[in-house]
């Protein structure tokens, strides 16, 4: 036997390969002609068609598709070069390979100078300190235990709503701190204040003395209910406090070594909180967009992901596990329904297409008519309330006073309650896919809720600037009805926020809890069982708090303490919604993923911020500021404080600022920004194409196993057939 083996080495080696097919040498004489076996794989052939592009990318970011045998070369080459700048934890390697990298790193440290070793050690210590600090801050998060409990019982979709509510609490607290540090704190620190120091900026001949009059309600015999009205509407004793714009009729605050410019600080605080909100929301939105971009998939991959990776392992409650099971089943049925509708759309005839588009056009006209009717009702309610508030408010009783003061808020709340029901009925006849139905309904409700605030503000603006006599024309605004129009706009925002808060509490206490009791203890009634238990609808609740946050953004300029009120309001709403969720509500069967929810929430919030910036910009740049109250009494508009401040700078700095803000600089800068934007758009398109190619490569690699098994089977047959042929 030994002779046979020695005399026929090829035969012996072939027999060994037959016993151990994984040790087959695919480049041996068994295969004629000898070729590299890996080059026959479907995935390798796909790579070969675009070898040039992949090689160019490999030089920049490392080879994506490499055999495991070349790993040692990769360790000795590209990765070891980056050990100085990147942590070993970032590499997708096993423990033994990471240990080898660590040994290489420690070996390299011995040959460095003391200065380089100290820099490496300092950088590593600083990174370790930052990681420990991040771990510590996670334990200091607001409502961390409550949100974890909600996540465990109801899943990540509802947990994302409460995390979003926590974000708004922190955001409003930061906004309040900005306003407090820039506006309130300097006033509280000193008793010396300067008033009307720059009155000469507005010549007396261009302004009537009536413009500077601000009649304050006389303090006589006041009924107790008047204090309740003042507390709910911001009038009376609250109107003269630091809650509203009219309290800050100060040009500056005098300290020992300098004078604090309060008008400039007031405007800068407004710009600062808007810019901070924008940057913070965009930053969080980009993170959510990245997750959505990574999870974007084709339809056939969606089914696999839902079946094999769709379970939420944070769920610890049995009933919630059953709900998640039904939710996954619902999502699969919805995907199949969308696929059926997609196939139905592809099979439509031209007559059916014309009929459907005609029906959609008609239904969208109805939607526009409903929106127009709501906006007109808000306009009429606001105009009626403003006209009768000053004339007949003293002659009315308690109930009539509240009705007049809160009439715009009541109409807006009714519109926000009725229109979603109408939109939900209309959308069923438009023949859209289920997913698009939800998105379009939410989009319409978002537009309705946020546009009502803008209609209210623009209605107030039209009433403020409508002039009917010479005094009004001299002042630039309707001084008779609005001697301090900024304060009255702040009062409207204050009333909207208070009324929205009252409605949320009333619905929870007087609708949700009684409904839960009826469903629990009146199970025999079919009508009550059909009514059912209240669902925790995530989109509706999100729209409610975004509506409140938009009010806060608009009203913070006219009522500087409104962010503090919003912070307290959202804190109470958190606990109220948590109790409502735990004891009165059941989650909606249409659940949201946490990543999709966070991105959707922030997108709606960003729309609200953009809509809030528009009326604020118009009020600061176009409408004349009040001459009887506020820090801008000596300026025609709020924005004029900026050029007035720039005029006090040195001439060289003024020249630089004027050059930067001129058209000669703006046009080239805009062109450069457009070029940069086009570059990033092209880069994003290239990256998208690479992602498509890599997905194709991934799907082709799934066929490699079948191909390898087929080749190994052929090799075994060929090896076994060699002795018989010999």
From Swiss-Prot:
It is a multi-pass membrane protein. One of its GO terms (cellular component) is plasma membrane. Disruption phenotype: Conditional knockout mice in nociceptive neurons display increased sensitivity to mechanical stimuli and comparable sensitivity with heat stimulus. Also display increased chronic mechanical allodynia in DRG neurons. Also display increased proportion of PIEZO2-conducted rapidly adapting current in DRG neurons. It is found in: Membrane. InterPro entries: TMC, TMC_dom. Keywords: Glycoprotein, Membrane, Phosphoprotein, Transmembrane, Transmembrane helix. Residues 1-166, 239-261, 382-402, 514-553, 620-663 are extracellular. The modification Phosphoserine is found at residue 87. The chain crosses the membrane at residues 167-187, 218-238, 262-282, 361-381, 403-423, 493-513, 554-574, 599-619, 664-684. Its main location: membrane. The keyword Cell cycle does not apply. It holds the Pfam family TMC. Ubiquitously expressed. Expressed in dorsal root ganglion (DRG) neurons and satellite glial cells. One of its GO terms (biological process) is sensory perception of mechanical stimulus. Residues 188-217, 283-360, 424-492, 575-598, 685-726 are cytoplasmic. Glycans are attached at residues 23, 94, 636. One of its GO terms (molecular function) is ion channel inhibitor activity. The keyword NADP does not apply. It comes from the Eukaryota. Interacts with PIEZO2; the interaction inhibits PIEZO2-conducted mechanically activated currents. Belongs to the TMC family. Acts as an inhibitory modulator of Piezo2 mechanosensitive channel in dorsal root ganglion (DRG) neurons through physical interactions or interference with the interaction between PIEZO2 and the cytoskeleton. This is Transmembrane channel-like protein 7. It comes from Mus musculus (Mouse). The gene is Tmc7.
